[in-house]
């Protein structure tokens, strides 16, 4: 799409962004706020951020959720700033350095929490730094400054939310309904591929695509939950559908793997049933009814366990899907499905990556402090703030370098655009509030169009331009002050980008190895006779880690197959009829301890030693299963697991 083109679907959000900025400006001046610029800047960032991420108008609830995160982050940052000032007001240099460490700590935390919640911690880090830097000349005004910042940011967020509600926000419900129908058809087609036992590359492409779509549906569920409380019932059902969809993928892929060694396990009856093509959800529903009749006639024992489980999961999917689309009262049958299992959350595999982010942010802020003190530049503080903002917000995203470049382009574009407004437009509007609002609305409208196109530098240009304009009360026009602010932003972004480029993040290989070992640990831990452990649902957490693996190593099919095999082993062993006795229970605990040692080992040598010990213990465990006459439903998945661990031993132990 060209830089000068305006698509019709982009106009509504551009008007919404302009309205949010104008409303924040009007309220700020009407109530005689000290710095209305903060309210305007907050309204712009809260409204434009989700649009840039979505590549279009954000769905209903996204702006409100981002606003709530900004309020939480601001309050945490203000409390931290006041605490640091109270404890270290007599040592200004130490106070600033501790603030740099606080910014790094918040970046570390934001790297470990869910991506959608990381914004609050990133904001908490640089908010404290902004307050500490701003009150250097008058430290006794810190409480007043913190209260003013909180109140003006809340006003900006309220204005953004009001503008969002005024222009009928887009509901994601119809997208959810369409995706639910399309997803079950794709699930059926994956099962057809697996039963045909065709090309492995085609199967890999199909299941990895379904993992991404299931993850995307979970993101839609979060948006729907933010949209309105009336979707609470749909939200509960969609949570369960996430697990059901992942179960369908797992059972289909296990069907494919079983046929590698035992192609006769899938009977001709089911091959014929799955041979019929399906195009719509009605076709899937019709086929499932036929399969349930066949299963009822032939009996569960004569039905392959993966197909039996798959048909049951697909039936539950259709039941829950119907409830989501109609948003009806939850029936007794649905309630039984919804209360089935306790979902376990995934443990972060990016601790080393988080520590790299901590050092990047801390070093960048300290470098800014040294630059400020060494040069004595009046806008060194502005450069420091930009360093903190760029590093705090960039680190959690997949490509921090591109975020830094986006900010750098934005600050470069803000220099001529800001100069036009500062020297020509704003001085001409001093006698009319209406003209001032119109002038800013025009700028917001056109930048809002570019933000939705995800134009590089557009979001940074919007924030940087508003930041250097004199939207204070009263407005004063000193060109030297404007130039200092603009250059301070530019230098800050450049220094932040240099730190991101120089402090390399070599944690990718380590993260990949940790993820794979987490899959191994989950598979080993599923060997248990404890009823409570068996009821724990690890599937969403395991697929969340698989999704991270897909993003970290795109195209590495061997890793994906290994991870998927571990997930299949986990699911099969979790439901396997393991003989119940004290001997096996004690050995299960020993296996879990050894798997935990592999996961937490601090060096490659220790990891290899513990992994070798785990393989030896698994050989002993297989012998114990033979002694206790365990059925094939137990011995076969254990043998498959041991074979995979032997085959990929180097990948699982070496960095």
Swiss-Prot record:
Q: Which NCBIfam families match?
A: PRK10631.1
Protein function:
Forms an efflux pump with AaeA. Could function as a metabolic relief valve, allowing to eliminate certain compounds when they accumulate to high levels in the cell.
Q: Which GO terms describe its molecular function?
A: transmembrane transporter activity
**Gene Ontology CC annotations of this record:** plasma membrane
Instruction: Give the family per the record.
Output: Belongs to the aromatic acid exporter ArAE (TC 2.A.85) family.
Query: Which keywords does UniProt give here?
Result: Cell inner membrane, Cell membrane, Membrane, Transmembrane, Transmembrane helix, Transport
- What Pfam families does UniProt report for this protein, alphabetically? FUSC
Classification via PANTHER family = MULTIDRUG RESISTANCE PROTEIN MDTO (PTHR30509:SF9), P-HYDROXYBENZOIC ACID EFFLUX PUMP SUBUNIT-RELATED (PTHR30509)
Transport as a keyword of this entry, yes or no, is yes
BP GO terms, sorted: carboxylic acid transport
Could you list the residue ranges that cross the membrane? 13-33, 38-58, 69-89, 93-113, 121-141, 152-172, 370-390, 407-427, 431-451, 459-479, 482-502
- Its chief place of residence is membrane
Q: What's the superkingdom here?
A: Bacteria
Where's it found, cell-wise?
Cell inner membrane
Q: Which InterPro entries does the UniProt entry name for this protein? A: PHBA_efflux_AaeB/fusaric-R, PHBA_efflux_pump_AaeB
List the membrane topology term(s). Multi-pass membrane protein
Q: By what name is this protein known?
A: p-hydroxybenzoic acid efflux pump subunit AaeB
């Amino acid at each position: 799409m060209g830089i000068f083109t305006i698509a019709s679907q982009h106009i509504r959000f551009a008007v919404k962004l302009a309205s949010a900025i104008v409303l924040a400006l009007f309220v700020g001046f009407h109530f005689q706020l000290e710095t209305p610029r903060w309210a305007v800047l907050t309204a712009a960032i809260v409204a434009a951020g989700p649009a840039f991420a979505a590549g279009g108008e954000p769905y209903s609830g996204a702006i409100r959720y981002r606003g709530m995160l900004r309020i939480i982050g601001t309050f945490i940052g203000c409390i931290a700033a006041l605490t640091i000032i109270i404890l270290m007001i007599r040592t200004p240099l130490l106070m600033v350095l501790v603030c740099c460490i606080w910014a790094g700590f918040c970046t570390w935390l934001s790297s470990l929490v869910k991506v959608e919640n990381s914004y609050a911690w990133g904001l908490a880090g640089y908010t404290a730094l902004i307050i500490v830097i701003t009150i250097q000349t008058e430290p006794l005004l810190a409480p007043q400054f913190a209260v003013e910042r909180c109140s003006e940011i809340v006003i900006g967020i309220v204005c953004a939310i009001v503008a969002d509600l005024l222009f009928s926000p887009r509901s994601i419900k119809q997208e959810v309904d369409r995706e639910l129908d399309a997803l079950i058809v794709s699930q059926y087609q994956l099962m057809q591929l697996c039963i045909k036992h065709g090309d492995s590359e085609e199967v890999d492409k199909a299941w990895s695509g379904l993992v991404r779509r299931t993850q995307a549906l979970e993101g839609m569920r979060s948006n729907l939950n933010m949209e309105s409380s009336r979707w609470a019932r749909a939200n509960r059902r969609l949570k369960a559908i996430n697990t059901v969809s992942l179960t369908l993928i797992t059972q289909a892929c296990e069907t494919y793997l079983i046929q590698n060694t035992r192609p006769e396990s899938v009977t001709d009856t089911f091959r014929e049933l799955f041979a019929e093509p399906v195009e719509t959800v009605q076709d899937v529903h019709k086929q499932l009814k036929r399969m349930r009749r066949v299963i009822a006639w032939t009996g569960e024992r004569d039905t392959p366990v993966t197909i039996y489980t798959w048909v049951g999961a697909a039936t539950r999917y259709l039941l829950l899907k119907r409830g989501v689309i109609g948003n009806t009262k939850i029936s007794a049958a649905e309630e039984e499905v919804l209360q089935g299992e306790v979902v376990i959350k995934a443990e972060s595999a990016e601790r080393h990556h988080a520590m790299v982010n901590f050092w990047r942010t801390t070093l960048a802020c300290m470098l800014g402090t040294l630059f400020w003190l060494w040069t004595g530049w009046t806008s060194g503080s502005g450069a420091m703030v930009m360093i903190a903002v760029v590093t705090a917000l960039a680190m959690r995203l997949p490509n921090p370098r591109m975020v830094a470049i986006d900010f750098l382009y934005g600050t470069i574009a803000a220099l001529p655009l800001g100069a036009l407004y500062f020297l020509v437009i704003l001085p001409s509007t001093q006698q009319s509030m209406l003209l001032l609002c119109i002038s800013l609305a025009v700028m917001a409208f056109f930048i809002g169009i570019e933000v939705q196109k995800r134009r590089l530098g557009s979001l940074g240009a919007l924030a940087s331009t508003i930041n250097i304009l004199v939207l204070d009360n009263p407005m004063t026009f000193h060109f030297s002050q404007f130039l200092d602010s603009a250059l301070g932003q530019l230098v800050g972004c450049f220094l932040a980008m240099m730190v991101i480029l120089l402090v390399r993040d070599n944690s990718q290989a380590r993260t990949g190895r940790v993820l794979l070992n987490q899959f191994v640990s989950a598979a080993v831990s599923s060997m248990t006779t404890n009823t409570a452990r068996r009821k724990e649902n690890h599937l969403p957490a395991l697929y969340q880690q698989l999704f991270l693996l897909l993003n970290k190593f795109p195209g590495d099919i061997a890793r994906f197959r290994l991870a998927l095999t571990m997930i299949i082993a986990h699911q099969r062993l979790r439901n396997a009829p393991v003989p119940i006795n004290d001997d096996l229970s004690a050995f299960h605990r020993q296996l879990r301890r050894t798997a935990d040692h592999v996961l937490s080992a601090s060096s490659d040598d220790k990891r290899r030693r513990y992994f070798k010990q785990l393989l030896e213990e698994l050989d002993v465990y297989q012998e114990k299963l033979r002694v206790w006459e365990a059925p094939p439903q137990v011995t076969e998945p254990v043998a498959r697991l041991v074979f995979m661990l032997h085959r990929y031993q180097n990948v699982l132990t070496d960095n």
